[in-house]
């Protein structure tokens, strides 16, 4: 595989959209395409420091509640660490990278959900500049259905416990951003898993991976 052929693919979506199964599908596709598995990451997280930040963001501390601005800045600190120490080095070595969330999550969740878009855009530009995925698959689902699926999995984390209106704003932002960026493909995640996977494979197969 040529070094300049390495791609960065990201799976995005609200809680309960089916990201985990989609990631497994795309990972298998990449491994069959390249003969080697991709480097898999998750956000926030993916490095020892970023995983510690993940715990701060995901686990509520009733004695020291995390304010919205701190949440945003912590997530970008984790992302900057991951991009610098894992994603960019992997791509430079010719390895494909498959991400469970990336910057689009912050634009949707902190920018739309928390209504902090000016802060998110400023920090995004400062930390990432023009770095972005080659392809993002956004699994779109009605927030009520997604949250019910998340509840069925078990206890909800701090982010998953946010009000329905938070996720409605996040979804609206996801769709607005997807409408103006051709590298973001919207997949209807309310379908059966088989239908969702069929759509994902169709998207992957029609990409120019040269």
Swiss-Prot record:
Positions contributing to ATP binding: 13-20
UniProt KW keywords: ATP-binding, Kinase, Nucleotide biosynthesis, Nucleotide-binding, Transferase
Protein name (database record): Thymidylate kinase
PROSITE patterns: THYMIDYLATE_KINASE
Keyword Cell membrane (UniProt): no
Enzyme Commission number(s) from the entry: 2.7.4.9
InterPro entries cross-referenced by the UniProt entry: P-loop_NTPase, Thymidylate_kin-like_dom, Thymidylate_kin_CS, Thymidylate_kinase
Catalytic activity: dTMP + ATP = dTDP + ADP
CC terms in the record's Gene Ontology section: cytosol
Class in the EC hierarchy, top level: transferase
Function: Phosphorylation of dTMP to form dTDP in both de novo and salvage pathways of dTTP synthesis.
One BP annotation, GO: dTTP biosynthetic process
Family indicated by similarity: Belongs to the thymidylate kinase family.
GO molecular function: ATP binding; dTMP kinase activity
Coiled-coil annotated spans: none
Keyword hit for Transferase: yes
Family annotation (HAMAP family): Thymidylate_kinase (MF_00165)
Gene designation per UniProt: tmk
């Amino acid at each position: 595989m040529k070094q300049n052929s390495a791609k960065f693919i990201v799976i995005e979506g609200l809680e309960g959209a089916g990201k985990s199964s989609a990631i497994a599908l795309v990972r298998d596709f990449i491994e069959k395409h390249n003969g080697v598995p991709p480097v898999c990451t998750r956000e926030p997280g993916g490095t020892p420091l970023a995983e510690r930040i993940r715990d701060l963001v995901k686990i509520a501390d009733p004695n020291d509640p995390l304010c919205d601005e701190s949440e945003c800045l912590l997530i970008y600190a984790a992302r900057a660490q991951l991009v610098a120490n894992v994603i960019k080095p992997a791509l430079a070595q010719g390895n494909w990278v498959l991400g469970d969330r990336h910057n689009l999550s912050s634009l949707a969740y902190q920018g739309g959900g928390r209504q902090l878009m000016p802060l998110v855009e400023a920090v995004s530009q400062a930390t990432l500049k023009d770095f972005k995925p080659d392809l993002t698959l956004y699994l779109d689902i009605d927030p009520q259905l997604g949250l019910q699926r998340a509840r069925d999995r078990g206890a909800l984390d701090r982010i998953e416990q946010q009000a329905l209106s938070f996720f409605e704003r996040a979804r609206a932002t996801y769709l607005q951003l997807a409408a103006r960026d051709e590298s973001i493909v919207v997949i209807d995640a309310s379908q059966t898993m088989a239908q969702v996977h069929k759509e994902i494979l169709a998207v992957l197969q029609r990409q120019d991976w040269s």
